[in-house]
């Protein structure tokens, strides 16, 4: 199945939600997952973590659906590890849509995904998480960016913003992709999005479209300031509305969410 002409040139679509919101969405259910994905889920022993993984994979399908115009069940993501060359893990991609990039993330009751032309990457972390001891971060991240974050009035949140930005760029596979970071206060989440074109960003669903630059219960989020050069808040286009009403709700080491 291929998207119609012009679809691949569409703006990226990025979605962020709680795991409960995703699992309650009427278009999404675990039956959409491929057999190889369900096989991998069988190895996850912690129910909450399993739900997070399911939610992220379903959200990726919803993003792909919004970009291609196909129903979520017609989208079949795959994964391939660039290191070992084996399938089933590593960077996600859409075999039937080679012009589109894909990325997802999950962490402690949160899920995020993005699909769009060219390289894309997304990362989400709980607002209260701290990425780890500074000496460890200096081994993983550019020293000058870590030092700049440490010089902020609140180093913990600044280091978390730095971490999610770098994770988003890592997932995109390039350091020169435009980067946007914002805080979703309603879901107590920090999000970073790397996308080659201006993304249609959405935090959750429901209600009328809200413009960028908001920092409340339903907005797309404000652009965070701090270490690293992000696009201004105005670069976020209005949030995508997926329905007439909101979705029903149903470390010493670096963050583990992916």
Language-model features, listed with the residues they occupy:
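Core catalytic alpha/beta fold that binds nucleotide/phospho-ligands
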Residues: 1-210, 215-258
């Amino acid at each position: 199945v291929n998207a119609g002409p012009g679809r691949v040139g569409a703006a990226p679509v990025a979605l962020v939600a709680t795991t409960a919101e995703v699992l309650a969405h009427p278009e999404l259910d675990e039956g959409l997952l491929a057999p190889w994905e369900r096989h991998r889920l069988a190895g996850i022993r912690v129910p909450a973590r399993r739900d997070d993984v399911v939610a992220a994979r379903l959200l990726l399908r919803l993003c792909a659906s919004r970009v291609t115009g196909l129903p979520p069940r017609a989208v079949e993501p795959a994964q391939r590890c660039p290191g070992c060359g084996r399938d089933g893990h590593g960077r996600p991609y859409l075999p039937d849509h080679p012009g589109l990039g894909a990325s997802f993330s999950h962490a402690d009751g949160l899920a995020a995904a993005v699909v769009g032309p060219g390289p894309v990457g997304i990362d989400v972390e709980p607002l209260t998480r701290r990425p780890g001891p500074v000496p460890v971060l200096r081994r993983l991240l550019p020293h000058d960016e870590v030092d700049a974050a440490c010089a902020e009035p609140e180093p913990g949140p600044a280091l978390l913003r730095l971490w999610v930005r770098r994770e988003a760029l890592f997932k995109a596979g390039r350091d020169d992709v435009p980067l946007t970071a914002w805080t979703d206060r309603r879901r107590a989440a920090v999000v970073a999005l790397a996308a080659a074109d201006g993304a249609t960003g959405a935090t959750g669903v429901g209600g009328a479209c809200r413009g960028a630059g908001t920092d409340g219960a339903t907005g797309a989020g404000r652009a965070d300031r701090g270490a690293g050069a992000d696009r201004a808040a105005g670069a976020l286009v209005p949030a995508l509305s997926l329905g007439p009403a909101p979705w029903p709700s149903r470390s010493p080491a670096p963050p583990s969410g992916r």
